[in-house]
Structure formats: structure tokens, C-alpha cells
């Protein structure tokens, strides 16, 4: 049970980290596109 819970927490952290990273990248690319226009 404990191991399964740890695995779930790890997967959730991974998902949140990837999500925030993706948002930062998309925000940065949108800003770059707006500046080049």
C-alpha cells in the first residue's frame, strides 16, 4: 500500500512538473512570436 501511494505521488509530481514546464515553454514561445511580429 505504502509503495503504491509513493508511486502515485511520484507520478503526480512528474505530471505537475511536466505541465508547468510546458506552460512556461508555450508562454515563452508566444512572447517570442509576438515580439517578432
From Swiss-Prot:
The keyword rRNA processing does not apply. GO terms for cellular component: host cell mitochondrion. It holds the Pfam family Rota_NS6. Keywords: Host cytoplasm, Host mitochondrion. InterPro entries: Rotavirus_NSP6 (IPR006950). The keyword GTP-binding does not apply. It is found in: Host cytoplasm; Host mitochondrion. Belongs to the rotavirus A NSP6 family. Interacts with NSP2 and NSP5. This is Non-structural protein 6.
